[in-house]
Amino acid sequence: MKLIFLHGLGQSAESWKEVRDILTDYPSEAIELFSSEVNSYQKVKERVYQHLAQETESFVLIGLSLGAALALELSSYDLPNLRALVLSGCPLKLSGNILFYVQLLIFKLLPKRVFEKQGADKALMVGVSEELKTLDLTDIAGICPYPTLLICGSKDKPNLSSMRSLHKLIS
């Protein structure tokens, strides 16, 4: 079974290199979510869906943070070869999430060079975060038909509550 990795916001497909290097017994692919032509969550979702819909072998979708939210959302699409999900640090509902709004405000206030030092694009991060302000995957999580492994570190305070809620909905 193939493993398909989706990275988080501010990261790249290269972020999964060490994990993929360890899992050499499994065919795998890390999808680059953003490019100069694909710079919004909606465009990413459509492009990744088109890619996954053409996948000819069974696969597990593995996502971190934004990639986990995307994986969960895509689980509600018609993907005949999708078999399971692995979600790490998945935001369930950003709509009304005070910490998320504070993060977005900080993104807007930070100078561009701070993002560039991290290899990130400020305009992209602010734009995608603005788009995600209304994200609410509660309904999708409640009907997710796939076996799902949820992963969240005990010190990941911003995501721990969300992952606990997700666990209740998926179980």
Question: Language-model segments: what does each one mean?
Answer:
Residues 157-163:
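Conserved alpha/beta-hydrolase "acid-adjacent" motif
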Residues 1-37:
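Conserved HGGG/HGGXW glycine-rich cap/lid loop of the alpha/beta-hydrolase fold
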Residues 124-140:
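Active-site nucleophile elbow and catalytic-triad environment of alpha/beta-hydrolase enzymes
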Residues 63-71:
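Gly/Ala-rich beta-loop-alpha elbow adjacent to hydrolase catalytic centers
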Residues 76, 82-112:
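Flexible "cap/lid" loop of the alpha/beta hydrolase fold
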Residues 61-63, 88:
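Short beta-strand immediately N-terminal to the catalytic nucleophile in serine-hydrolase-like folds
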Residues 42-59:
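Conserved acidic catalytic loop of the alpha/beta-hydrolase fold
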Residues 143-144, 150-152:
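Short beta-strand/loop motif that positions the catalytic acidic residue
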